[in-house]
Amino acid sequence: STKKRKDFLCDQLKNWPSLFNFLNQKDFCCMPLPNIYPTMNYDPTEGGLFFYSLEVARTLQSLTTHMSLTWKREESPLLIGLLHAIWILDDYYCVPFGDSQEQLGLLRNESPIYPPGYGDKSLILLMNHIDLTEEEKLCILYHRGAFTEMQYWKYYCKAIKKNQNVLFTHTAICSVIF
């Protein structure tokens, strides 16, 4: 249920109440997942974005454990997994449909506040709510990996050389979406 998802999120983000309040206000826990990539098994049901993001966080944590990855902050895999796709909260919004007000649909926001973007837009949306480490910022910024626009590939490669976790973040996402 949405309440269970909110309770879980509140517990995980207890050190960042402003972030939890922002996500709660933006309907993160009930937002369906839009069909972003044609090959992605997306979840158009209530909570799809939450479940997808949590699965990325769990996959990144599993990679961390099995590959002995190190992070500047212990919570980084969770934060990166949960927050990398926050840009969706500016590009889409939930609308009730059907006989039940609990059924949700997804509409494209025709007048988002910020310009189009993925990781960069997520960072803009997050900057007033949590102080991310440089490592977390790079992982969120380049979470799309090779799907990052071509003109940014050289920066993506530099980010990987600076911190290998940038690559493993993209690996975790790919293992969830493909």
Where do the protein language model's features map onto the residues?
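Acidic/His-rich, divalent-metal-binding segments that scaffold phosphate/diphosphate chemistry
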Residues: 1-103
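A general boundary/transition motif marking the beginning of the first structured unit of a protein
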Residues: 7-11, 110, 128
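A general structural-boundary detector
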Residues: 40-43, 109, 127
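Charge-dense, low-complexity intrinsically disordered segments
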Residues: 47-50, 109-113
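Histidine/acidic-rich helix-loop-helix segments that form or flank divalent-metal centers
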Residues: 71-81, 120-178
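Metal-dependent catalytic cores of enzymes that make or break cyclic nucleotides
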Residues: 98-110, 156
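Phosphate-backbone recognition surface of nucleic-acid-processing proteins
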Residues: 112-120
